[in-house]
Swiss-Prot record:
It comes from Methanocaldococcus jannaschii (strain ATCC 43067 / DSM 2661 / JAL-1 / JCM 10045 / NBRC 100440) (Methanococcus jannaschii). InterPro entries: DUF473. It comes from the Archaea. This is Uncharacterized protein MJ0105. Pfam families: DUF473.
Length: 152
């Protein structure tokens, strides 16, 4: 398995198929179903709690990312990638940290003009995500997080 990408496209296709089945089961009130095993996904940390609550409420959200560490993650994202999002700061991440699992719908880097700083322009990442469910961190390394996952 390629270690530079968290999940292969074939595995993601199968995962999405399984998630649709789990979603149907969840709609039938079988809400304690878990996706088996542990997944390795990208992570975005220190996200504003209001933004996370909006994401949970609407199930789709475009996040604007300017934090340098999170921007490094955004640069690696592609459509269909899975992302663990949490309000917990990267350095405070521990086993059991809770967050949201989302799937990338769209990703882009956008230059923005700023005033009052030595530089005139910053690069922001914009990531549109679809909520898949809730997740807990099992292990963290660099820009990847290993998680367990539960459908909402």
């Amino acid at each position: 398995m390629d270690t530079t990408r968290p999940l292969s496209w074939d595995f993601q296709s199968q995962l999405m198929s399984n998630l649709k089945i789990l979603y149907c089961l969840n709609m039938l009130k079988l809400s304690n179903w878990y996706f088996g095993g542990i997944m390795k996904v990208y992570g975005l940390f220190g996200i504003n709690e209001n933004a996370i609550n909006d994401f949970i409420e609407n199930h789709i959200k475009t996040f604007t990312i300017i934090n340098a560490l999170n921007l490094e993650t955004v640069k690696n994202l592609k459509e269909g990638d899975l992302v663990f999002i949490t309000s917990t700061l990267r350095e405070d991440l521990r086993n059991g940290t809770e967050g949201i699992l989302g799937r990338v719908i769209n990703v882009s880097l956008v230059p923005q003009m700023i005033n009052g700083f030595e530089e005139k322009e910053i690069i922001a990442g914009r990531v549109q995500l679809e909520m898949l469910g809730f997740a807990k961190c099992v292990k963290y390394e660099s820009i990847h997080v290993e998680i367990t996952f539960r459908m909402y």
